[in-house]
Amino acid sequence: MAHKDPREPFTRLSPTEVRRMMENGGVQVIDVREDWEYQNGHVPGAEHIPVNTVSARRNELSRDRDIIFVCSVGQRSALACEMAAAAGLTRLYNVEGGTEAWIKEGHAVEK
């Protein structure tokens, strides 16, 4: 279930909540893992912006859509949310448990 910690500039979502948001449209999904991790399987439609490039590539982040960050377990994506917030973005979400939880819940990945 969605969880917003007032100390964090993002909302934590379960993989199922993310899938629902994606089905409704109007979201940008960003996978912040390394190239080899992304190539081994990622959330369908996710754009690839490695966490160490998020600040430099902030102009690629949507200012008019919800942005969902995902990594392997949710730590690097939380850092990416922090970077996006520092760039002035506010509609930020982190996939709780990352791609591992996405797969564990039975959602498909693409390669």
Q: Where do the PLM segments sit?
A:
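Rhodanese-like catalytic fold shared by cysteine-dependent sulfurtransferases
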Residues: M1-Q28, D35-D66, Q75-K111
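Short, surface-exposed ligand- or partner-binding patches at beta-edge/loop junctions that are enriched
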Residues: V70
